[in-house]
Amino acid sequence: MSITTERIAAAARKLCEAPGPSGRECAAYAAAKELLSPMGEVKRTPLGSLLCCVNEGKEGAPHLLLEAHLDQIGFIVTRVEEGFLRFSKVGGIDARWLPATPVVIHAAAGDYPGIITSVPPHLAGDGSDHSIKIENLLIDTGFTAETAAKLFAPGDIVTFAAKPVELQNKRLAGPALDDRIGCAAVIAAAEEIAAEKPDCKVTVLLSSMEEVGGQGAETGGYCGRCELWGWLWLRAGENQSPGRRHHAGLRPHPEPGLYPEAEKAGRGK
């Protein structure tokens, strides 16, 4: 079984369809567990990260941890106000592109569609500050004030309603690709490792809460007790030309000798 674009894209779509803002990764955790369970026992850390040993390795061999973060950016309801929902962001979100964005409210009684709205520009008054601030935005669900008060409550999570779509040239677009595409790549690599059974021990960590501080990765890494840590993350920019098989970047403190070896592997040498 070889790693292919199609396999990674299929896993990414499955993961992206599961809601999982930081701290509420349960549905995304369940989707990832389903994909990883055939390779080993899946455990959940106290902060909600997923750990799965996919290869026990030989005694005394190094322990490699492959990690990507499972959570996504999203929102949380802070107040139900005359049928509308006030909300706060979970993770780094620019409020300027939020108006008219379709969302899903995950309430106790089920999932409900909504749309982010704001005061129209021509009704905003003559003040000089027309910048969009998240505290001035609302989610419109279409319900009456009485019904909304029964259905929704502070603490309900909200995610983007968009679904992953395949673009031309095998490109995938959609919510939560940061970092579900990294999770899909880690899972694909785990399948290869489980089949080939190398000497080293290999554990997969799909971490929680990266978008709000990275607590899941920090604590999950201690649970894994590894010597080497490989981290896959979505990167935006123009320094990755189409058709290249890999993208590698240097951090301030890389393991000596690891970067050249990773680069060789990426080039197929």
Feature roles, as predicted:
Residues 1-269:
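N-terminal hydrophobic/helix-forming segments and targeting peptides
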